[in-house]
């Protein structure tokens, strides 16, 4: 059973790799999701895509992985609060609630990874 549960780590890495690649591939299409109070627009889409891919590399290499997944959790929480919660409060698409809950769960997954799977604890004690 522990072998199956250990796969969760790799599923999180796969998820972040896929989302990071999607941000880089479809940056122009996703740029409309950047809140208007964030200057730079599409730059944030590419920045977050690169950040997700770097977190995956960090997790596979075991270097700076605790820091990477702590920061990735904060990044996804910012997505939840500035994009999905704002969309929910605007009364838009009902799917936004599911995106909000997904990102809250993903924040927890990143922080659990940082807490239980990270090998390099040099930056975050």
Where are these regions (language model features)?
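Extended, low-polarity transmembrane helix blocks
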Residues: 1-25, 44-54, 60-125
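Short juxtamembrane and helix-loop transition motifs at transmembrane-helix boundaries
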Residues: 7, 26-38
């Amino acid at each position: 059973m522990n072998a199956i549960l250990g796969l969760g780590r790799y599923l999180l890495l796969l998820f972040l790799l896929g989302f990071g690649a999607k941000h880089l591939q479809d940056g122009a299409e996703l740029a409309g999701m950047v809140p208007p109070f964030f200057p730079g627009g599409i730059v944030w889409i590419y920045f977050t895509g690169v950040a997700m891919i770097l977190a995956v590399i960090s997790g596979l290499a075991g270097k700076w992985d605790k820091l990477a997944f702590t920061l990735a959790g904060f990044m996804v929480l910012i997505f939840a609060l500035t994009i999905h919660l704002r969309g929910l409060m605007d009364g838009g698409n009902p799917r936004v609630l599911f995106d909000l809950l997904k990102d809250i769960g993903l924040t927890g997954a990143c922080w659990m990874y940082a807490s239980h799977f990270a090998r390099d604890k040099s930056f975050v004690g």
